[in-house]
């Protein structure tokens, strides 16, 4: 898999996991989540759509805002990507 397509797959998976968490979090709106946890609404929307590659600190904050630890978010992301996903071809 080309590096660019791996990055796209990763960004879409991050967005899907965050969207799933937000929906499970009493179906909280992006606006409410952004306002309550001081996360930029536009960035949050772009992250959920998979068009923005967020910083690690932002991902951590979004995970916590959705009621999960960062490590649990990482596990969900790994499950979404599949065990054989890697950025580095060995």
Q: How should these model regions be labeled?
A:
Residues 25-46:
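Short alpha-helical DNA-recognition segment
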Residues 1-27:
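A short, Lys/Arg-rich alpha-helix, primarily the initiator
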Residues 57-72:
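DNA major-groove recognition helix of helix-turn-helix/homeodomain DNA-binding modules
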Residues 49:
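Short, conserved catalytic or interaction motifs in soluble domains
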Residues 1-5, 74-90:
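Short, charged recognition helix plus adjacent turn
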Residues 22, 34, 63:
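The alpha-helix within a helix-turn-helix
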């Amino acid at each position: 898999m080309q590096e660019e397509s791996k990055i796209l797959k990763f960004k879409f998976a991050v967005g899907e996991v965050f969207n799933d968490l937000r929906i499970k979090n009493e179906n909280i709106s992006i606006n409410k989540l952004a306002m309550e946890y001081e996360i930029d609404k536009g960035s949050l929307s772009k992250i959920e759509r998979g068009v923005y590659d967020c910083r690690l600190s932002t991902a951590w904050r979004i995970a916590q805002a959705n009621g999960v630890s960062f490590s649990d978010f990482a596990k969900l992301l790994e499950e979404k990507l599949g065990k054989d996903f890697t950025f580095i071809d060995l």
